[in-house]
Amino acid sequence: MDQAKLARMQASVRIGTFCSFLWIFEVLESESVFSADGFQAHHLGNVIGKGTPRRKVKKVHKSSGADDKKLQTTLKKMNVQPIQAIEEVNMFKEDGNVIHFAAPKVHASVPSNTFALYGNGEEKELTELVPGILNQLGPDSLASLRKLAESYQNMQKQAGAEGKKDEDEDDIPDLVEGENFESNVE
């Protein structure tokens, strides 16, 4: 291949993109894409040319519906029955807090000793729920509630005692560098 033929081929074919970018910005300036309000990007689509549009990434959200369906089929195998007219469910924890379910869906299977609760549980302190739940409790529950209240009070006392220990430590002065207080005692 001779040099003249190679030069003609290179002239006919665009090699590189630098020239095309210069051409784009010259066209943009001539079309007043840069206005007083700022850069208007919608003009770029007309100038740049053909191409495939950007495709949005499809996000797959894993729904809890599939988990609920699996749970429902398992509960059907256990022959659970829905229990109606339950307004709230409270689960007492050892640390004195309560998991409170307002208007839950409850299913039960007495032969297999299985109960299922559906709903949003909120963790609340025992003191928030005490006035409203006292009339719902039986004698056995009242005894366990007393034990729970005692443990809650003990926890509060321990937390208060730890706070006082921290206050006592604040009264002790820090040693100043270079001074030795033991030599003064002797």
Swiss-Prot record:
Domain NAC-A/B as annotated: residue spans: 65-130
UniProt superkingdom: Eukaryota
Pfam families: NAC (PF01849)
GO annotation, cellular component aspect: cytosol; nascent polypeptide-associated complex; nucleus
Composition-biased stretches (Acidic residues): 167-186
GO biological process, alphabetically ordered: protein transport
Subunit structure: Part of the nascent polypeptide-associated complex (NAC), consisting of egd2 and egd1. NAC associates with ribosomes via egd1.
Matches recorded under PANTHER family: TRANSCRIPTION FACTOR BTF3 FAMILY MEMBER
Protein's job: Component of the nascent polypeptide-associated complex (NAC), a dynamic component of the ribosomal exit tunnel, protecting the emerging polypeptides from interaction with other cytoplasmic proteins to ensure appropriate nascent protein targeting. The NAC complex also promotes mitochondrial protein import by enhancing productive ribosome interactions with the outer mitochondrial membrane and blocks the inappropriate interaction of ribosomes translating non-secretory nascent polypeptides with translocation sites in the membrane of the endoplasmic reticulum.
Protein name in the entry: Nascent polypeptide-associated complex subunit beta
Gene responsible for this protein: egd1
